[in-house]
Regions:
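Short, basic/aromatic-enriched C-terminal tail that caps enzymatic domains
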Residues: 146, 331-349
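Interdomain hinge/lid region at the active-site interface
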Residues: 262-268, 274-334
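Internal alpha-helical scaffold of NAD(P)-dependent oxidoreductase catalytic cores
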Residues: 43, 66-75, 153-268, 272-277
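Rossmann-like NAD(P)(H) cofactor-binding subdomain of soluble oxidoreductases
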Residues: 72-154, 179
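Phosphate-coordination loops involved in phosphoryl transfer and adenosine-cofactor binding
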Residues: 28-30, 114, 160
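Short, well-ordered alpha-helices that flank and scaffold nucleotide-derived cofactor binding pockets
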Residues: 41, 45, 49, 107, ...
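NAD(P)+-binding Rossmann beta1-loop-alpha1 motif at the extreme N-terminus of oxidoreductases
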Residues: 2-85
């Protein structure tokens, strides 16, 4: 067993670390991480810092596939184990490996009925760990809504984030009735909630078998924003704006839009209903669609068509805005119909 040398010392966001009160080790299961990539290292460090018993981590054989943990500091004080040692010492085994490797790695572990098999993928279904369930183990998905490209930063910014959790109980356990109903009554979900809160995360319980939809939705709120920024920059390039000025102007605009959405959600939370949970976001929309400014919308569409650009994308985004504005009651029926009619002129034929 090896231990990386210098412990990681949080500097980028020490206030978040101070907000977490370490929980006595006996209150949590013993956990081990199979895989020492960015997610595994970040979570192992966060759990260890919070007082959760992290018994060790497993990394691939360094002769065939070196794992770059030297100098990272996130795994300092956490023993490196063999796969056999991890299975013997841990109650929860976290498979923090690439999605395509989850099933293969799960098949190589000597599972027992006291184990909980965990993966951190957003889209991969829990059935990828079927071999663990066949051995009597419970399955759990634990997907922090967090960016792990910079692990040291990720450790410090975990507090305040949400985590998507899905559970498939062991064969001997009662069947899961529904994500929210079981959230307060199932011991396994209570344990998962306690672990999440130990590192400052708030759970979102996912309906079984719907991870792909959950992950696609998260993608809209994350990387899809980057695609929209790129599309905006492409239009600006045609408008003659210097490339070095584009992101300097667009990124603050995007940040202010997110801030407006947060404010609208907080101010109009009482308007949200089960049938229209995102209605408050309609109050954050600005621009010609929000004003029902038909002339401007038509000029936008004409310009895009003239330059052979993506009119369908503009229409699709505008139609989503119309739906939100309608749910929020921000436009009259007459205004909504006028915007829809303007968009329909450019519908594919």
């Amino acid at each position: 067993m090896t231990r990386p040398g210098k412990p990681y010392s949080a500097k980028t966001n020490t206030s978040s670390a101070r907000r977490l009160t370490p929980v006595p080790a006996q209150a949590h299961p013993r956990i081990a991480f199979i895989g020492a990539g960015r997610v595994g290292r970040s979570l192992a460090c966060a759990f260890q810092r919070a007082g959760v018993p992290v018994v060790g981590y497993v990394a691939r054989d360094q002769k065939s596939a070196p794992v770059d943990t030297a100098g990272d500091g996130l795994l300092a004080g956490i023993p490196r184990l063999s796969l056999t040692e991890a299975a013997l010492q841990a109650d929860w085994l976290w498979l923090t490996v690439p999605d395509d490797h989850i099933a293969h790695v799960a098949d190589t572990i000597a599972w027992r009925d006291h184990h909980v098999a965990v993966h951190c993928s957003g889209a991969t279904e829990l059935t990828a760990m079927r071999s663990a369930q066949n051995a009597g183990a419970a399955l759990l998905g634990f997907h922090p809504l967090q960016i792990f490209s910079q692990p040291r930063i990720a450790v410090d910014t975990l507090p305040g984030s949400r985590v998507g959790i899905e559970i498939a109980h062991a064969p001997s356990a009662p069947a899961q009735r529904g994500a929210q109903e079981d959230a307060q009554t199932t011991p396994l979900q209570q344990q998962a909630t306690a672990l999440a809160r130990a590192i400052g995360l708030t759970p979102l319980f996912i309906r079984p078998g719907q991870r792909a939809l959950y992950h696609a939705g998260a993608g809209y709120a994350a990387s899809a924003l980057v695609s929209m920024l790129a599309e905006a920059a492409n239009l600006w390039a045609l408008a003659g704006i210097e490339s070095e000025d584009m992101l300097d102007a667009l990124l603050p605009l995007a940040s202010k839009t997110i801030a407006a959405a947060e404010a609208a959600a907080a101010t109009n939370a009482t308007n949200a209903t089960r049938s229209a949970p995102v209605a408050p976001l309609g109050h954050a929309i600005a621009g010609p669609v929000a004003r029902a400014d038909i002339g401007v919308i038509q000029r936008h569409l004409q310009a895009l068509e003239t330059h052979g650009l993506d009119v369908a994308l503009y229409r699709s985004v505008a139609e989503k805005q119309v739906a939100l504005l309608g749910q929020a009651g921000a436009l009259t029926t007459t205004q909504l119909d006028a915007v829809k009619a303007a968009l329909a002129v450019y519908a594919p034929r």
